[in-house]
Amino acid sequence: MGYIPPPGDNDDNGKKSNKKTQNTSKPISSDSTPDGTTITIINPMSLIPRNPSFGLIWGPLTPASDNRPAMYTMVALQIAIGVRFFRYARTHLRRHPVPQAQFHAPPGLGVNSMISTTANQTYSAPPQQFLRRSKGDVFKSILAITTGSLLIFGSGLEIARMMLPYDPWYDEAQFYRKQAVRNGDKPNFWFGAYQYYQPMTYKEWHSKVSKWIDSVEKEIKVDETTFVIDKDGKARGGIGPAGVGYVNGAGQQSGAASAAAAVAKPLFQIRNRAKYQQIHAKLYNANETRMRELLANELNDTNVNELNKAERLDKILEGKSDLVNPNFNKPSISLGNHPMESDDEFEMVWLNFEPWDELKMETDYDIRLIPRYASVEELEQVDEGELFVVKKEELGETDNVVNESS
């Protein structure tokens, strides 16, 4: 879709000025013009995937953050390479024996035996000799140990990132992968929809994770969920007053269990924190609490029954009922009867109720500027604006229209 302005009297002047101020550099992208066709040059850097990671060394071969099987595969391969470097260093640092000629002991004696004869002669195996390590072997071993340590350390950082309940890189890659599917494209299984976005920097990632950790810490402080240590040492969750620890039969709390539970409580809550399931659980609990309050007070059997049903409906339709909130004019969102046992299922159901995205996909804007005539018109001024002669050429016919101004 494009807009081509109609030609006017200033076209020639514009062409002359464009020729004088013409830029010699070629544009990256442009559209067709009446003067000619401009070639679009694609930036080759946009064809190279730039998936972020903490410690992977694969560069453009790094898979997308939302492709967990590929990420674990590359991490395992990097760990295997690091272990191979350690084995290389161990081989070069190990003492290698010097090959010797086979020693033959007298008959009846072993190689490592030692005995004195009548001639006071002693037979024993010669001492084992080893090759001396050169400086080159030591340098290669140190370099191999350093490289292997860096590879394994980077793999550990990547595993720690993938174990986080909230990973901005994962959410970003997953969002644009789904966006590409909605637009009719098929994103790459390994690299994702890397052509749709520029991954966020490490500084932005660190800022988002820090804010998430702060919010989790605040929620943990005010959360009423308690983690109780059972007799077998396992932690279980329960709803009750703030306080942790195993209470024995005498009603006293064990000091060791209390200390262990105090340490385990924030760790369990951060590790088991879900994204969408927890949001759904909070909404469900809030709705259940509100429903019980309404049924116990405003919607009890005394106020709501079949005898006053017609009166209640009339007040609701007229907007005079106490149950009508004038500030609320938005219907509730129903998630339907779809199964929501996991985060993926809940997210799939939730994405079906995005009105702005649906409106964007269903709406097609097409703007057309319709001129007064289908062909070029020539306007001539006669007698200082009092008489206009319009010459219109359309379909091979020529008409002269004379209009007098009042």
From Swiss-Prot:
It is found in: Mitochondrion inner membrane. Residues 1-68, 161-406 are mitochondrial intermembrane. GO terms for cellular component: mitochondrial inner membrane. The chain crosses the membrane at residues 69-86, 138-160. Keywords: Membrane, Mitochondrion, Mitochondrion inner membrane, Transmembrane, Transmembrane helix. Residues 1-36 are annotated as: Disordered. Residues 87-137 are mitochondrial matrix. Pfam families: Mgr1. It is a multi-pass membrane protein. Component of the mitochondrial inner membrane i-AAA protease complex. Component of the mitochondrial inner membrane i-AAA protease complex required for mitochondrial inner membrane protein turnover. This is Mitochondrial inner membrane i-AAA protease complex subunit MGR1. It comes from Lodderomyces elongisporus (strain ATCC 11503 / CBS 2605 / JCM 1781 / NBRC 1676 / NRRL YB-4239). The gene is MGR1.
